[in-house]
A protein has these predicted regions:
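Acidic, histidine-bearing metal-coordination/catalytic regions of metal-dependent phosphoesterases
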Residues: 1-23
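Core catalytic region of metal-dependent phosphoesterases/phosphodiesterases
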Residues: 2, 24, 28, 33-103
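Beta-strand-turn-beta hairpins that frame and shape the catalytic cleft
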Residues: 19-26, 137-145, 204
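Active-site neighborhood of phospho(di)ester-bond hydrolases with catalytic His/Asp-centered motifs
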Residues: 28-29, 54-58, 81-85, 146-147, ...
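Active-site environment of divalent metal-dependent phosphoester hydrolases
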Residues: 32-36, 62-65, 87-92, 152-154, ...
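Active-site neighborhood of divalent metal-dependent phosphoester bond hydrolases
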Residues: 67-137, 141-143, 160, 165-178
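Short loop/helix-cap segments at secondary-structure boundaries that form the rim of catalytic
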Residues: 73-74, 200-206
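Binuclear metal-dependent phosphoesterase catalytic core
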Residues: 208-232
Length: 232
């Protein structure tokens, strides 16, 4: 991994969450700073933040100029956010003064930060550091892995000790999709990821890849019960 992990070192690698069966649970792919697209997707399913839960698979920052507003909105609706490689770039750029990270960040949609105050950016970074690199969700009898991406032969029950390897595997890896091998997401019934841009969601083994915002023109919002219904 060419980008340092000084800032992201302290972030939790995995968070376990249980949600009652009667609750509606949604998962959304990369948002790329597009607040109107998020609101439109949620309105289409009559999302109620008092009753429903939203999981974001990372890369909610960058590209769109509404990144800061999008982040505060996600907080307001109590969305469960997972970090992606763009959040990693932001944290290392602003907190670690990592020049390689900053150059890559600003070349790939990070320039929105120039119009946001340093105070707001500082608060945002502090909040991002409280978000995990992955979530293992128990819902309706299924164990579901959620992360920005994942590596071949990833074992959700046994993470490596090397934090840089975890970051590389869960935030940056593209080998599973590039090679299109039937790989298994070990230790979970299935897993859901963003990161790998596609026009339509697709399965590789028991992993589901839903980053449609870049090529498909809008983010994919899944209702988890509907995904589970196709597996039962």
């Amino acid at each position: 991994l060419d980008i340092g992990i000084n800032a992201i070192q302290a972030v939790s690698s995995k968070q376990a969450i249980f949600i009652n069966d009667e609750c509606r649970v949604f998962v959304i792919g990369d948002l790329d700073g597009d607040l109107p697209a998020l609101k439109n997707a949620l309105n289409n399913v009559n999302f109620d933040p008092e009753r429903d839960t939203l999981f974001c698979l990372g890369d909610f920052v960058d590209r769109g100029d509404k990144t800061y507003d999008l982040f505060t909105y996600l907080q307001a609706i109590r969305a469960c956010m997972i970090l992606g490689n763009h959040e990693h770039l932001m944290l290392e750029s602003l907190l670690s003064n990592d020049k390689a990270a900053f150059n890559l960040w600003t070349d790939n949609g990070g320039n929105w930060h120039k119009s946001v105050s340093s105070e707001k950016l500082s608060v945002m970074c502090d909040e991002l550091l409280t978000k995990p690199l992955s979530i293992v969700l128990e819902y309706r009898g299924y164990i579901i892995g959620l992360s920005h991406t994942f590596a071949q032969s990833w074992d959700w029950e046994n993470y490596p000790d090397d934090k840089s390897l975890i970051v590389q595997s869960l935030l940056w890896d593209r080998e599973v999709v590039k090679q299109n091998k039937v790989v298994k997401s070990h230790g979970v019934d299935f897993s859901i990821h963003g990161h790998n841009s596609t026009k339509a969601p697709f399965w590789v083994g028991n992993s589901y890849h839903i980053d449609t915002n870049y090529y498909g023109g809008k983010p994919t919002l899944l209702e988890l019960s509907e995904v589970i219904a196709t597996l039962d």
